[in-house]
Amino acid sequence: MNEVLAKGKRAKEVAMNLVLKSTSQKNEALAAIAERLIVETAYILEENKRGIEEGKAKGFSDSLLDRLMLTEQRIVDMTEGIKQLIELRDPVGECVSAWERPNGLSIQEMRVPLGVVGMIYEARPNVTVDAATICLKTGNAVILRGSSSAIHSNKAIVAVIHRALKQTSLPQESVQLIEDTTRDSAKQLFTMNDYLDVLIPRGGKQLIDTVVREASVPVLETGAGNCHVFIDETADKQMAFDIIINAKTQRPSVCNAIETIVLHEKWAEQYGSELFSSLKKRGVELRGDQKALAMDSSIVLASEEDWWTEFLSLTLAVKLVSSIEEAIHHINTYGSMHSEAIISENEENVSKFFVSVDAAALYHNASTRFTDGSEFGFGAEIGISTQKLHVRGPMGLPALTSTKYVIRGNGQIRK
């Protein structure tokens, strides 16, 4: 039996053990992981540096290197996320609803773990910690399959997690990493129906599309973030500037950063040139339609592909429109149903935007950068779902549970 199947089989066995663990036992394991990550920070950073140096030698982009990079502060942030997770209510065993039938049967709908979660993801080693700890908190076994670019960091983090779990009542194999990063191992994971209850892809559009297209196991789709901000005619100038600059430049390599600004022509006539200048001073490359080019000749003419692209860098597309209806049509055509924002003082337009735009998170007068489990108060998240079944938006603890019905009687038979 090869590595992937062997780990799948073991995960299925471990999941049956995890469902018996109490909240306190799971929280003790999480606390041990948080402590161990701090104790072994130097080891993790050493392995991360090894991966970064290999990435530079291979010519990785700055945005990819940023996603791969770990620092002492990022590891501290991971542990803070775990501590927040410990404080969150455990959804497992929670009664979702309860009622009694006329025949005396008492019916309860209860939350239960999904079982075995497969996680396939690119670049970010912090996902290794997020996925492992959220799965443990919800009583799920997890099989992790990261990318070759992050293999050194991922192996180090999982080794640290195993050393932490060894001191607790949870099996070390509750968290397993597939070290084979070839396409063959991914394809096996896609079809491991006997062992996986759900597969969650987290990464770029190509990875997600491949998983959705090829997997036979149930998939929780975490879509790419082709996010937009629409600046309505009535938008406050300073607010619009602040939100656009934050949503694009604070951390351009993440999925909740914006990739296109849609400007109402009347607002752009007054403030567009100044906005473009402000963005360019911050290193942003602008790609716009003909109307944008007429305002600023340094803007590159946007191609059809640009409207579809999640740049994950300091590149921003610019679209000018004459109405909110045109803005909504553009966003619904090219958006990835992740996060979309409107900056406006017109409540009627805001309401129209909220009703008409199809996305997991919609914002009024705020940056899209808040689409995040911790910012929503969920603690660490396992991803941001852009699909409509099971769960949508940042996936916190309840997203990694299912339900079952528990029926109590006193001898009832069906007539």
Swiss-Prot record:
One of its GO terms (cellular component) is cytoplasm. Transmembrane segments: none annotated. Its main location: cytoplasm. It is an enzyme of class 1 (oxidoreductase). It catalyses: L-glutamate 5-semialdehyde + phosphate + NADP(+) = L-glutamyl 5-phosphate + NADPH + H(+). One of its GO terms (biological process) is L-proline biosynthetic process. It comes from the Bacteria. It holds the Pfam family Aldedh. InterPro entries: Ald_DH/histidinol_DH, Ald_DH_C, Ald_DH_N, Aldehyde_DH_dom, G-glutamylP_reductase_CS, Glu-5-SA_DH, GPR_dom. GO terms for molecular function: glutamate-5-semialdehyde dehydrogenase activity; NADP binding. Pathway: Amino-acid biosynthesis; L-proline biosynthesis; L-glutamate 5-semialdehyde from L-glutamate: step 2/2. Gene3D superfamilies: Aldehyde Dehydrogenase, Chain A, domain 1, Aldehyde Dehydrogenase, Chain A, domain 2. Its EC number is 1.2.1.41. Keywords: Amino-acid biosynthesis, Cytoplasm, NADP, Oxidoreductase, Proline biosynthesis. It is found in: Cytoplasm. Belongs to the gamma-glutamyl phosphate reductase family. Catalyzes the NADPH-dependent reduction of L-glutamate 5-phosphate into L-glutamate 5-semialdehyde and phosphate. The product spontaneously undergoes cyclization to form 1-pyrroline-5-carboxylate. This is Gamma-glutamyl phosphate reductase.
